[in-house]
Amino acid sequence: MIWHVQNENFILDSTRIFMKAFHLLLFHGSFIFPECILIFGLILLLMIDSTSDQKDRPWFYFISSTTLVMSITALLFRWREEPIISFSGNFQTNNFNEIFQFLILLCSTLCIPLSVEYIECTEMAITEFLLFVLTATLGGMFLCGANDLITLFVAPECFSLCSYLLSGYTKRDVRSNEATMKYLLMGGASSSILVHGFSWLYGSSGGEIELQEIVNGLINTQMYNSPGISIALISITVGIGFKLSPAPFHQWTPDVYEGSPTPVVAFLSVTSKVAASASATRIFDIPFYFSSNEWHLLLEILAILSMILGNLIAITQTSMKRMLAYSSIGQIGYVIIGIIVGDSNDGYASMITYMLFYISMNLGTFACIVSFGLRTGTDNIRDYAGLYTKDPFLALSLALCLLSLGGLPPLAGFFGKLHLFWCGWQAGLYFLVSIGLLTSVVSIYYYLKIIKLLMTGRNQEITPHVRNYRRSPLRSNNSIELSMTVCVIASTIPGISMNPILAIAQDTLF
């Protein structure tokens, strides 16, 4: 009898929750239409997986890619609409949020074709992989539009949980298990510190959770200069720092990059930084409006440490993925310059533009690494020696992406860094920009060292896998080559005509 009553209560509670969710989607669904498309794609993938066999695997890639493209299309159709706050203040839709959502969708769209051959060769479970990627993308999109503390905590947790599962996807690999454990433990610790900072904001503002209402609450309670706000600022900086992975919050990055499957690393290396940058700009700029000098100082320290440590340690690496891990730490230091500058001197516009170029440069580099790794089974930098004689297209693509990451003209990375540094210089960040210029020269050194190895190097201890390298055809149906070509083109051409991109980015004020 008791069990029967409990069962009825459970059914009634579940029905109420379902009806409330249906009511929210019915009246607010148009505000999150791109996200609803992703949810529909997730449900469709689950249904097809439960009713089909492994022969339908190509359909999984098609559905995932189509879902992402449709979501991008819906996002573009919504461009330039009036800012809207929906779901009782939990979610905000405006141009600033939408351009970050576009970048996340773009990352995921490019990462799926990059992963196809890797999944086929390693015999990984395809459905779960795509489900995790789409769910992480969904979490990142909700994070970009988050307008209250609860959503700002739940959305990154959705992204992070999928990231942990993806990083440990190759369960038989000891390095992957070690990387996942470190990633999970440090991620959990950082999330607890982040929510601790949120609790101080909540209490200091008189129980407000919406970002703008927190500012009003701090004014009413006269707590905007209190020690509690300083504690909240430090805690939230540490929590967001783990997602952005600047120094000294970068300890997990090299191990996760080296131990995780390469397509997963490609996905995490860009989407996590885009989503974290979107949330960082809103959190620092709105609730901590009265503490701008303090958070500027904190971010300047993080940027300096990231640019110096990231680029110097990258020189000593022998693994390609670990080198890119430390390189990404240096790159996030450049992005932080744009966050510090803010709207005053087009800082956000330059940050968004550089982020777009960074996506193409980084994913192009990882596409080359995936292709080379599948044919050789090695990740060691010395094994790339003389690759130009074996596969000129792959070597040239890798060289262009690395040169663009280093910021050599006339590639996209050069113009992105140039505008970013110029905005920082106009804002008076002379020391920070000088450090950025010097560390960019350091990064060019280790990128050129690899390119020299690609073009002229000869390795006397070359492995049998590299010696028997199978050259890819000039025209290939391989999806990796498709992603690689798109990223290489995007890493070179936009730098010459970047004014339209900057104009769009300048129109994303919130």
From Swiss-Prot:
It is an enzyme of class 7 (translocase). Disulfide bonds: none annotated. Its EC number is 7.1.1.-. It catalyses: a plastoquinone + NADH + (n+1) H(+)(in) = a plastoquinol + NAD(+) + n H(+)(out); a plastoquinone + NADPH + (n+1) H(+)(in) = a plastoquinol + NADP(+) + n H(+)(out). GO terms for molecular function: NADH dehydrogenase (ubiquinone) activity; quinone binding. One of its GO terms (cellular component) is chloroplast thylakoid membrane. Signal peptide: none annotated. GO terms for biological process: ATP synthesis coupled electron transport; photosynthesis, light reaction. It is found in: Plastid, Chloroplast thylakoid membrane. It is a multi-pass membrane protein. Pfam families: Ndh2_N, Proton_antipo_M. InterPro entries: NADH-Q_OxRdtase_suN/2, ND/Mrp_TM, Ndh2_N. The chain crosses the membrane at residues 24-44, 59-79, 99-119, 124-144, 149-169, 183-203, 229-249, 295-315, 323-343, 354-374, 395-415, 418-438. Keywords: Chloroplast, Membrane, NAD, NADP, Plastid, Plastoquinone, Quinone, Thylakoid, Translocase, Transmembrane, Transmembrane helix, Transport. NDH shuttles electrons from NAD(P)H:plastoquinone, via FMN and iron-sulfur (Fe-S) centers, to quinones in the photosynthetic chain and possibly in a chloroplast respiratory chain. The immediate electron acceptor for the enzyme in this species is believed to be plastoquinone. Couples the redox reaction to proton translocation, and thus conserves the redox energy in a proton gradient. NDH is composed of at least 16 different subunits, 5 of which are encoded in the nucleus. Belongs to the complex I subunit 2 family. This is NAD(P)H-quinone oxidoreductase subunit 2 A, chloroplastic. It comes from Dioscorea elephantipes.
